[in-house]
């Protein structure tokens, strides 16, 4: 998969290219990340990349010419079929369904804004889609771009150590992930659930699904509103709610 980065701070992406799952993907040749800085396309001796906005107001905008030239260079390197994305608070909010959708593209170009943003005409002329990672303000598009890259890279065959990992991630089926445990079996009096030590894979699968449904109900109930639960899922969720109510009643009685 090819991912081009247009950013004033390409060095930030070493966190993606040199470390962790994405770093291994780059080393294995599964992920090709290249970057272009608008500063390298500035024509003046100060390498200016910002300009004043028409109409006044605080802050500056990214200068049109260096930014467009950097985008054009990224497009030329990517070749036909590259989707150009601008990381923007005005964009579609990234979720697991969106990640899965973006992962079907073999070529992405991510444009990272700075200052107060970019000229609207650049967005209209050069950008295919705008994406956001949440309703809050950041200093630039680099961190959202890294988030997008990390999440999309998990779908590339061979990137994860276990192919089931991406399938079982939180949100992969619209639910939060279930609790996980490793050694020791007892930690400060807290024991690993016996079912996970039983070796009964059918019961383990059932327990994990119940916990996943229950955790979603407790922490992100709005996610369940968009799901058509199977008969098994509905039954397990009902069991979880009953067990949770019993635990709460027991806890309240001890208080």
Curated annotation (Swiss-Prot):
Keyword line: Cytoplasm, Methyltransferase, S-adenosyl-L-methionine, Transferase, tRNA processing
GO annotations of cellular component type: cytosol
Recorded superkingdom: Bacteria
Listed GO MF terms: tRNA (guanine(37)-N1)-methyltransferase activity
GO process annotations (BP): tRNA N1-guanine methylation
One Pfam family here: tRNA_m1G_MT
EC number from the UniProt entry: 2.1.1.228
Keyword Lyase carried by entry: no
Gene3D superfamilies listed in its UniProt record: 3.40.1280.10, tRNA(m1g37)methyltransferase, domain 2
Reaction equation(s) it catalyzes: guanosine(37) in tRNA + S-adenosyl-L-methionine = N(1)-methylguanosine(37) in tRNA + S-adenosyl-L-homocysteine + H(+)
Coiled-coil region(s): none
Residues annotated for S-adenosyl-L-methionine binding in this entry: 113, 133-138
SUPFAM superfamilies: alpha/beta knot (SSF75217)
Localization in the cell: Cytoplasm
Main subcellular location of this protein, as a coarse class: cytoplasm
Function, as annotated: Specifically methylates guanosine-37 in various tRNAs.
Assembly and interaction partners: Homodimer.
Family as reported in the entry's similarity comment: Belongs to the RNA methyltransferase TrmD family.
Name the UniProt record assigns to this protein: tRNA (guanine-N(1)-)-methyltransferase
Lineage: Bacteria, Pseudomonadati, Pseudomonadota, Gammaproteobacteria, Enterobacterales
């Amino acid at each position: 998969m090819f991912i081009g980065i247009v950013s004033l701070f390409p060095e930030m992406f070493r966190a993606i290219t040199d470390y962790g799952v994405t770093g291994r993907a780059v080393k294995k040749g599964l992920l090709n990340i290249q970057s272009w800085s608008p500063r390298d396309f500035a024509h003046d001796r100060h390498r200016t990349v910002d300009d004043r906005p028409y109409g006044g107001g605080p802050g500056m905008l990214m200068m049109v010419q260096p930014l467009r030239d950097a985008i054009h260079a990224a497009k030329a390197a990517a070749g036909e079929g590259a989707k150009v994305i601008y990381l923007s608070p005005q964009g579609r909010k990234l979720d697991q369904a969106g990640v899965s959708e973006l992962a079907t593209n073999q070529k992405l170009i991510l444009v990272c804004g700075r200052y107060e943003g970019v000229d609207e005409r650049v967005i209209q002329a050069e950008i295919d889609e705008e994406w956001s990672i949440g309703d809050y303000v950041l200093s630039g598009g680099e961190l959202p771009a890294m988030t997008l890259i990390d999440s999309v890279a998990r779908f590339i065959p061979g990137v994860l150590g276990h192919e089931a990992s991406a399938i079982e991630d939180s949100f992969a089926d619209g639910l939060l992930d279930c609790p996980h445990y490793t050694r020791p079996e007892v930690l400060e009096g807290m024991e690993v659930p016996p079912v996970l030590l039983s070796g009964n894979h059918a019961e383990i699968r059932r327990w994990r699904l119940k916990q996943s449904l229950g955790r979603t109900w407790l922490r992100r109930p709005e996610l369940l509103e968009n799901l058509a639960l199977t008969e098994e899922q509905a039954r397990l969720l009902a069991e979880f709610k009953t067990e949770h109510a019993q635990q709460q009643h027991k806890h309240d009685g001890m208080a």
